[in-house]
Amino acid sequence: MNAREQIVRVLEEVFEQGGYSNIALNQALEHSQLSDKDRSFVTEVVYGTVARKITLEWYLAHVIEDRTKLDPWLYYLLMMSLYQLVYLDRIPDHAIVNEAVQIAKRRKEGSEKFVNAILRKLLREGLPAVDTIKRKNKRYSVEYSLPVWLVKALIEEYGEERACAIFKSLYQRNKSSIRVIDLDEKEELAQLLEATSSLLASSALVKEQGHFAAHSLFKEGRITIQDESSQLVAPALDLQGDEWVLDACAAPGGKTTHLASYLTTGKVTALDLYDHKLKLIQENANRLHVADKILTKKLDATKVFETFGPDAFDKILVDAPCSGIGLIRRKPDIKYNKESADFVSLQAIQLAILDSVCQSVRKGGIIVYS
């Protein structure tokens, strides 16, 4: 499977199966034989296509009468090809079209003619002008690929000028950050990875760009991908090594494994509602060699006190479910999975979780709410 075929597969998983873009991408690249150059290309196009989804759909709607008649993979092939045509200037247009045609031909004989016709029509006629959209919120929605409700909410909260600055900031390139498992190796790994020490977290290394999930150090469990701010959470619990710790909302396990790294005789109980998310925690724990410190349990975090009773844990982490809006730049698919009504329901869930877990912490214990 070549790089562009890999991109289509990842987009199918994200848009059709509801997968997380970062996890779907990491898993795909972990099992691929692509070169480092191709891995970087796949990463850029996957995140770019997901981030620009609304914009790309608007463009395609002008040349495709009914997308529901298309196989999903075919539509995502067109979407990722259009992303390259619009936003990447280092690849010749004819090469992008030719690659898309070849992929279509391999997957479904005859579909290559449709792909060729659509992409060449867009190149020949040019893209429709976004500034012709009369309704302001809709125009910003298409221009910045944001749901209309979010555009409206941000303008109401911050005013149009500042909101537009926020919209633009969502497309600034993220730095890649990792957590070094053995701090004695930090300097050595920084040189090896050509990364620099974080100014925020003592265990973090940062780099302008890079796909660490494909690196042998990641597979060996010597590094793991984790945001700098996320790495500040575990130290806040002031773990001494022998505590019984609860991670009430644990998936995918980044903070759970970080907590476990501080323990000697203690244990972390990691909760989640879904089996596939518990599996992610277990996979991370195995890779980072802390599986013996982690107990996973399928449980609604609002049922902690009902299940474990009083004084069950020395320390508790509540990484409560939230809108995730602040993570859009790093996890662009978040913005398509939320609605304004979610904010109200999330508040009730957050309070219910906190009300339950606070009854299960021992006297003198610590609860960190993040």
Task: Give the residues covered by each predicted segment.
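S-adenosylmethionine
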Residues: 1-370
